[in-house]
Every structure is written in C-alpha cells, then in structure tokens.
Amino acid sequence: MYRLNYEQFDRDNQYIGNDLGAIMKEGKTVFKTWSPLATGVYLNLYLDGEGKSRLESLPMERLDHGVWYVEILRDLDGVFYTYTFEFDHKTRHETIDIYAKACGVNGNVGAVVNFKTTDPEGWDKVKKPKCRNACDAVVYECHVRDFSADSSSGVASEHRGKYVAFADKGTKYQGVNTCIEHLKELGITHVHLLPVEDYATVDESKPWLNQYNWGYDPKNFNCLEGSYSTYPYDPKCRIREFKQLVMALHENSIGVVMDVVYNHTYYTEESAFERSFPYYYHRIRNDGSFSNGSGCGNETASNHMMMRKFMIDSLRFWATEYKIDGFRFDLMALHDIETVNIIRDELNKIDPQILMYGEGWTGGESPLPADRLAYKWNSYQFGRVGLFNDNIRDSIKGGTFNPYDKGFVSGNRNAASTLRRGIAGSVPHYPVSYTHL
C-alpha cells in the first residue's frame, strides 16, 4: 500500500479544473481522470453497457497534477467506456470512471451522453419552486419504488416503482387520490427521495425478481439508479425519466431533495475509488486498514482535497443538470466541517435556496478528530446547514439501541428537559444544564 503524507501530497497534486470525466464539445470527446501514482492509464471504449464488446483501448497522456488525458476527434454520444489503471508497471485495474455521469446496466461501465438530448419536452420552461426560508420547508420522505409499486397506487402497470410514476396524473384508489395527486393535497413543500444515485445490491438486469434496497449502498455517485428506470440498458432512459419526475413535482410547486451518501462506498477494495487510486479516497488507520466510521466497512476522506473536490463537483452536477432543490447528507458527521461549509458556499453560488441538511452523527469511530467532524454539537460552526435531532426523538420514545432506555412517553420524566429544548427548536436556553441533556 501507499503511505502518504496526505496534506503534502494534496499540495503537490491537487487539480482545480472542472473538466474531469468525459466531456463532449465541438465534435470531439475529451476524457480526463486523476491518478498521480499510476504508471499508465488506458481508455477502453465499448459498444455495449455490459463491457462485452470492446471497440478499442487507447493510452492516455499524463499531464500536470496527476491528470491523465486523451482526446478523440469524434462525437461519442452513446458510446460506453472504462479506464484501466496501471500501478508499478504491473498491477492493472479496469474500472468505471468515478466521474461517469451515466452508465450501463448495473453500473459497471460508464457512458458518454449528450445531456441536451435527455431533456423532456418543457424541461427548460418549468421553474423551480421558491423556498425563501429553510424553516418554512415541509419535507415528505419517499422511496421511489414504494411510492407506486403496489397496484393500489393507480399508476400504469409499466410505471409502478419507477421514476415516471411521479408524472402519472389523476391516479386514484377507490376514489381516493394517490401518488402525486395525494402529495398535492398534503401541503408539503419538498419531497425527499431516498437515494437515487446508482447503488450496488439490486440487479437491474432482472426486474422480475422481488428485489429491494433503501439505496444506502452507493456504487456510482454521479449516475442514476437503473432499477427505477423502465429500461436500464439505455443510459439516457433513466436520465430522461428522472427529469420527468423532477419536472412533475416542480410543476406542482414541490421541490426535490436528494439523499446523498458520500460517506462510504458499498465496495471497498473493489470500488472505483480504490481501483483509480488506492488508499486515497478512503480514510486509512495507522495500521494500514480501512477505517469504518460508517459502520459499513469503510469511510470516505472528505478532508483529502480531491475527495472534497469530487463531492463538490458531484453536487454541482446534480443541482444544475437536474435542478435539485436540496440535499440530505447521510452520516454527515463523517465529513469534516471545512468541507461542509465549502459545499454550502458552492451551493449558494448556484441557488441560495437549495436546502442542505444531514445526520449529525457517525456509524462508528473515525480517525479524524471529533472537533473537525460535522457532528451535531459542532453545528455552531456551520452556516445554513441543518441537522437531524435524534435527542428529541430519543427523549420521546427512548433509546434506539437499548430497549431499557425509556423515553418521556414511557414514564422517564428525566427526559423532560431534553424534550422541551427539542420542541423549542434546540435554541440555547441558559437555565438548562446542557451537560445533563
């Protein structure tokens, strides 16, 4: 493994350009990837999205700051691709581009896409709903499949459990409004979608299987999950259908909040991060093992400059290409405070009304010091970033992990102070002894 002084390494190798990935422009396609310690990188082009029919493999040229580059003088819209990274002139890893914005079925191969061809009719005319104050947001949490999978949803059978179900109008069950017609009745301002970024554990090629996952097993952070598409083999299909979802909600003055899971990857050594540049994008303990602050086997290293850049670039892409209105960060406390504040600043440049909130806790112990992490008790260091309050939750019902830890409704009157503070929005109340909360 590589033992790096990450701060010095970042100073020497940080890349600040906004052109990593596959970029189409003026009849040519440019590919750039970052891997400073690679001794060779190759671009592999495929005819299909499963990586079975290779067209050609091209060596990439090394530029400054660890960037590898190749330019192809033709429009590759619809062509699939991967990279092969070579280390020490012998170890070779083929993988999807971590910056891929579209992919084939099951997310093993990236796709070059002209996003202008994915816009549904009327996409440019629909305006984002206004939310002038985040405190006014009324958020409805929703899983794409759960929203319409049952026949009682009233959605067309081919749309059940899919992105496009949100665009089906006039749906009812026994005279009662369902799906988007029901959402319109609720008075909500936003729908928070459980993860729609491409995740690992549902086989998109077998839609007839009864498969299900919440989506907290991230695989490709910039690609959409294909199991919610009516045809996952076509990269443009899931993009167009998700835009139809966003458009349908926006037409009814409902914003879209994405649940983002940048804190870990489902795979560790086999992840695209590790295959692109081993031991950089994840946090590593002093003994060389992967730290596990997520409780899922690893945690990403937002304090490393190029992981931070990846998160910022990814969020900027979702906010601009898909007109997303908010981001909910899973296990946000695994990200360092500096990164969280930079993200807020970058989102403000796009739209100050974009919501940003997350979980102010971790799923395990992180090697990064607690005073640098975005824990809820460090919230005074954030600007316009909300946090979930598990204190009020536990004060009402009791502890989450200990069945004998009672809450107020179970007779624990000692929880009253915490409950009162939560009802008041956790605003500091100086007569309260916070050391006992």
Q: What are the language-model segments listed below?
A:
Residues 145-322, 339-351, 355:
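Substrate-binding/active-site clefts of carbohydrate-active enzymes
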Residues 42-44:
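Beta-strand signatures of extracellular beta-sandwich domains
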Residues 1-26, 54, 62-168:
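The feature marks proteins involved in alpha-glucan
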Residues 27-31:
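Structural beta-strand segments of beta-rich domains
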Residues 35-40:
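Short proline/glycine-enriched turn/loop motifs at strand-loop junctions of beta-rich domains
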Residues 33, 142, 193, 318, ...:
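Conserved, mostly hydrophobic/aromatic
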Residues 344-437:
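Conserved alpha/beta catalytic core and glycan-binding cleft of carbohydrate-active enzymes
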